[in-house]
Each structure stands twice: as structure tokens, then as C-alpha cells.
Amino acid sequence: MNKLIATILIISTSLTIKAQNIKNIADSLMLKNGIPEIGFAVITPDSILDLQTLGFHRTDIKNEQTKANLSDYFHLGSNTKAITGFVAAYLVENNKITWMTKFFDLFPDWKNQSNPAYYEITLADLLSHRAKIQPYTSGLEYEQLPDFKGNKSEQRKQFAKYLLAEEPVKDGKQIYNYSNAGYSIAALMLEKVTGKTWEKLTKEIITQQLNANILYGWPNKLNLNQPYGHWVENDTLIPLYPDNSYDLALGEPAGDISMTLPDYAKFIQLNLRGILGEDNILKASTYDYLHYGLKDYSIGWGNINNNEIQLSEHSGSAGTFFCYSLLDKNRKIAYVIVANSATQESQESILNILNSLREKYAR
């Protein structure tokens, strides 16, 4: 997580771009690197300074119907983690659970079939990647799993039992060990204390409290006129069609929400206000914990937190979209950039656009 944020700090010290037209910069990068669609937002506590989507939903059809617009959904990938963390925080504030609630206090009958190394893990451990759960960040790990049955929640429960019987990560001296799978286990804890599925909880808390729509899975499964994710086959960037078998249900709480850029900007703005001291849906102290409560990675957010700099950030990609968010507490501003391609060239373009936005808007 912090590799990208460190790169931002290094590059931003030598920027020469002076308030250029960001649209022209993005258009040029998209053309050069074959990126179908890009969106970006610049957010302050009381306004949205810039909000644009550019390009087309897919590489194979470019017309008025597939032209980018602000109602387009983008897959957030691992930026879903901040949403799951937000839901957990809401339940903590409403006394449904605590950050220090132990998994096996909620599921004591699982102990005998689980690895004793996990007996003391807490909700906070799971959401901050400190539970030493195996990562499940590659498709190969999922391909080797048994065929779990039932609805998504039931499958995740079987997945969690499988995970807790595995050996823990051999971490050496790392502060945290990034794990998508840990979020699936954390989601079970939230489901247990509420009697509601993770999907229902996110709908209730994000959609109803924030008035922001969310979609589970790929945008083009909602509507064929939504953006298609893209990946490379035979050196060609191709769209991922909605009937593709690529499915993230087991890791949904870690990385399978899609949102429109305006609605995701609402979520980021809410967090920005919170870390700047505003009580809103959550208390300001809770936002501070979510973003900065733990070193390097807290609850759904990577961070740099010292006397000079307070930044929180996250990138997300399941290989077909890319999403990046940065909250700069010192300058009271946040940035979001999304794309429906996650190639190396796409990620470098996103970094270039980010630096251009920071040069133009950060004061």
C-alpha cells in the first residue's frame, strides 16, 4: 500500500506542471496508453472542485451510447475495504461489537477445528491485516479452494472455516500482512452480531445513511451500458464481458463493490470531514482511528502519520479496473481517480494525473 504513497511524495517534490488543463493531460495519457475510461474527483470538506469522466465504457465499441458519463459505475476493488471498515465502525458506535471483540468469542464452536494460532484474533486484527490470515490476493489461491455451496454469505462462512484451519502467515517482523481473506472473516463477525448479511448491512448503512448507491460485482452485470473492465490477452487489451466466470463473491467484503464517481466522492468527502474533526455519521474520533489509529495500515486505510504529514490512501484493483484514493489532512483535500483498466501503463497514468491534480489544487 505505502509503495504508491511514497512514490507520490517523491514525485510531487519535483513537479513542473502548472495548473494545466487536467482533461487535456488525461486525454493524452489515455490515448498514449490505450486506457478506455478514466474518472477523477477533487474533494474538499465543503465542495467538489473537479469531477469528470472521460473516454468510453469499452475498447470494442466507441459511440454515444458507450461514452463516459457521471452515472458510470467503477469497480472499487480493495477500496471496498474502507467501506467494510466504515460499516464495522458504525456497529461499534452502536454497541453491537467492539474493535477488540475476539472472533472465537462469537464462534466458540469453531475452535476445535481451527488453528490455535488464531484463537486471540480480534475484529481490529482482521480489518488491519494483523491476524496473519493467508493473503488470497491472487487468483491461483482461489482456484485451489474446495467448491463451497449455498448463497454468498454461506459460502463465505465455509471459506472462513477453511482459512482458520490453515497455517498463519510467517511474517518475520512486518507490521501487517495484507489479506483479502481476513475481511471475509471480519464480515462474518458483523453478520453474527446483527443477524444481517454483509450485503444488507452495507446497503443499509451506505445507501440509507449516506444516500449513495452501491453495486456488488462488475458494473456491466448491472447494465450492458455500464463500463466494462479490461485485461490483457495476447498483448491486446480486451473487455471483460458480463457472462465471464470471474467472480469475487468469497472476497466481496474485501474488494467487490462498485460505485459511481459522484457517490464514491460523497463517501470520501464524509471521511475527509471526519478526519478534520467533524462528527457526522461517525464520530470524528472514530474517523481518526479508521485512518490513523494503527501504524502504516489502520482500518481499510494505509497511512503516513507523523509530525509533518498526515496522509491516508488506498488503491484497489481486481485486475480489470483500478481505483485510487488519497486524503491529505494537512491540506484539507482529497483525490479519487478511477479507470476501467489496471495495466501498468494505466496505473502510471493515474499517478501522473494525481500529481497534476495535486499541483493544481493543493495549496
What are these regions (language model features)?
Residues 26, 40, 46, 75-103, ...:
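Active-site SXXK
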Residues 98-114, 208-209:
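Short, glycine/proline-biased beta-turn/loop segments that scaffold the active-site neighborhood
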Residues 47, 56, 115-317:
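Short, surface-exposed loop or secondary-structure junction motifs
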Residues 307-310, 341-363:
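Short, gly/Ser/Thr-rich active-site loops of penicillin-recognizing serine hydrolases
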Residues 1-22:
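Bacterial Sec-dependent N-terminal signal peptides
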Residues 22-74, 96:
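Short, conserved catalytic-motif segment at the N-terminal edge
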Residues 324-341:
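Short, well-ordered beta-strand elements
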Residues 319-323:
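Short, surface-exposed coil-to-beta transition loops
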